[in-house]
Amino acid sequence: MTTRVVLGSASSGRLKVLRQAGIEPLVVVSGVDEDAIVAALGAAAPPDQVVCALAAAKAASVVESLPTEVATDCVVIGCDSMLQLDGRLTGKPGTPAAARAQWQQMAGRSGELYTGHCLVRVRDGVAGRREVEAAATTVRFGTPPPADLAAYVDSGEPLGVAGAFTLDGLGGWFLDGVDGDPSNVIGLSLPLVRRMLDRLDLSVPALWTR
């Protein structure tokens, strides 16, 4: 029997990363209150702790709602990403005004994109071993002309992504580069997930669906 991969995220970027890496996951979106978790941790919580707590909460929520036939043998992947700039963590801007302000702050500078990952091994309907870890990648932002920034914000893309930018979409035009793992910037670090799967005694090739 093939172990099924379950992605606990609505992120099209994370789904694309897995698909391009040979895995067609089942997508089960969690109903986690992210703001409540961040508030409970407090402003002084380290960024890796914050994203790992969010990823773990998402994975736990998804485990509880797995279809019976999938819970027989699967691994759940929960992720969450946030950008740290000037010691402050930011998630999805949500509004055009917030996205515009975010870009005005980070244009021409560098920030750290943190992604928390939580993998839960589920067999015979029971959640077993769990791995939780974060990865960080430095992102170097360009300085888009005002008209370009306005067009990008108007596209709607930056409103629903951590840090108000994407590497693999329209936002990629306005990045000068990344130092580290690019898949982590998209929202799921393939090198880290491979190591976490190995610790769960799961082989990456055995999970390929093509």
Curated annotation (Swiss-Prot):
Function per UniProt: Nucleoside triphosphate pyrophosphatase. May have a dual role in cell division arrest and in preventing the incorporation of modified nucleotides into cellular nucleic acids.
Name this protein carries in UniProt: Nucleoside triphosphate pyrophosphatase
Active site: D80 (proton acceptor)
GO cellular component, one term: cytoplasm
Known cofactor(s): a divalent metal cation
Native organism taxonomy: Bacteria, Bacillati, Actinomycetota, Actinomycetes, Mycobacteriales
Primary enzyme class: hydrolase
Recorded GO MF terms: nucleoside triphosphate diphosphatase activity
Cellular compartments annotated: Cytoplasm
